A protein has these predicted regions:
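Short hydrophobic beta-strand element within catalytic cores of glycosyltransferases
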Residues: 107-110, 125-126
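Acidic donor-binding loop of glycosyltransferase active sites
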Residues: 75-93, 103-107
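Short glycine/serine-rich donor-binding loops of glycosyltransferases
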Residues: 95-98, 113
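Short beta-strand segments
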Residues: 24-31, 62-65, 110
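Nucleotide-activated donor-binding/catalytic signature segment of Leloir-type glycosyltransferases, i.e.
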Residues: 32-79, 83-84
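A conserved mid-protein helix/loop that constitutes part of the nucleotide-sugar donor-binding site
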Residues: 1-14
């Protein structure tokens, strides 16, 4: 699971279990295809993870499965009940969804590794971790290079960050707004056109 959704879910549940006031987690995901069978597989995995967490009161997790239009994604990023964006991804080429999320003026929490660090500055919440060998079963047959590594966030640190953002939200909003302004300017259509013209 290149996005490390399993450990994101487990960390979230462990962090906020048995609390009277809890945030919820919205998972925008799909497996191989946006089919009913795939959705059921995603929900089954979610139930398996929930079953590993000991707690009487677990926070809600909402699953948005399949493809959304650009307008629907924009509505999700900017919905007033969505307070932050989080990813435990093991690695990205560029990480466009994280760039889009950064434009929402809400805190973005992501690993301090891979393509997205090109646009997630110190105004984002970058999680420490370590490079680890990619497990054989994570790749399709005959597609794995032995030396392949990916990044794994420090889950204990991530848990503390999630809790602090939930309890002290206002201290993160100024940086989130700064990140949005920088990225709107740096990655606008005009700015990207100019960069491409310089390359060509």
């Amino acid at each position: 699971d290149r996005k490390d959704l399993g450990m994101l879910i487990k960390t979230f549940l462990e962090t906020f279990k048995n609390q009277r006031k809890q945030p919820a987690l919205i998972l925008k995901t799909s497996g191989a295809t946006p089919s009913i069978l795939d959705r059921e597989e995603v929900l089954s995995k979610l139930r398996q993870i929930r079953d590993t967490v000991n707690g009487k009161l677990l926070p809600n997790i909402y699953v948005l499965h399949g493809d959304l239009s650009d307008d629907e994604m924009n509505g999700l990023y900017n919905h007033p009940k969505v307070k932050a964006h989080v990813s435990f991804t093991h690695g990205e080429g560029f990480g466009r969804p994280l760039l889009e999320a950064s434009l929402s003026e809400k805190p973005v929490i992501a690993p301090n590794w891979s393509g997205h660090v090109d646009f997630l500055s110190s105004n984002a919440i970058l999680l420490p971790g370590s490079l680890n060998e990619v497990k054989k079963e994570s790749f399709p047959k005959n597609m794995r290079v032995k030396e392949s590594q990916w990044f794994t966030v420090n889950y204990n640190y991530a848990s503390k960050v999630l809790k602090d953002i939930f309890n002290n939200y206002s201290k993160y909003t100024v940086k989130a707004k700064k990140l949005s302004i920088v990225n709107q300017t740096k990655f606008s259509l005009d700015a990207m056109t100019k960069k491409f013209e310089e390359i060509l």
